[in-house]
Amino acid sequence: HEYQAKDILADFGVDVQRGMVANNKDEAIAAAKKLTEETGTSLHVIKAQIHAGGRGKGGGVKLAKDLTELEIIVNQIIGMQLITPQTPPEGKKVNKVLVAEDVYYPGDSEPQEFYVSILLNRGVGKNMIMYSTEGGMDIETVAENTPELIFTEEIDPVHGLYPFQARNVAFNLGLSGDAYKGMLKFITTLYNAYVESDAS
């Protein structure tokens, strides 16, 4: 589940969206109150926890502006049969949600969503970073229609990630200032988590 993956990444020092898993509306409200104390915002993202991607487009990820909205959304999502392109035709039943802080990458201008992943390129037998300025939810469509908007960095299997490759990622994403520095740290810690947890 997403919440478990985030716990693993956080253990390696990767900055992740804060959140807590909830099995019912009471747990969700308690989680939201605690997150509001920690973050100062009453905006929360409610995310269905199933083993499939495409949850947002299937109605399994929603923004709650207050506790009343949160309760309504949690009641809608928990127990639903969530159908996404990655589930069987009948979907998967949602038994829990992640109540998470509403975040954007802290850029110098308007908030923007990026896609970043580290994966094993089986064709060349090397790990690589794949990334794009064209957000996370529609990356398959981006790859199909505008592949020139997807960048890659092949990682040397002996040396590992070179510092200039992390800089390439931040530069190609158009970042500057604190956002640029933050992305360097993010890429480095994400790569370390990938290697140390043997995620390939």
What positions do the PLM features span?
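Gly-rich Lys/Arg/Thr-decorated short loops/hinges at beta-loop-alpha junctions or inter-strand turns
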Residues: 8-14, 54-57, 148-150, 161-172
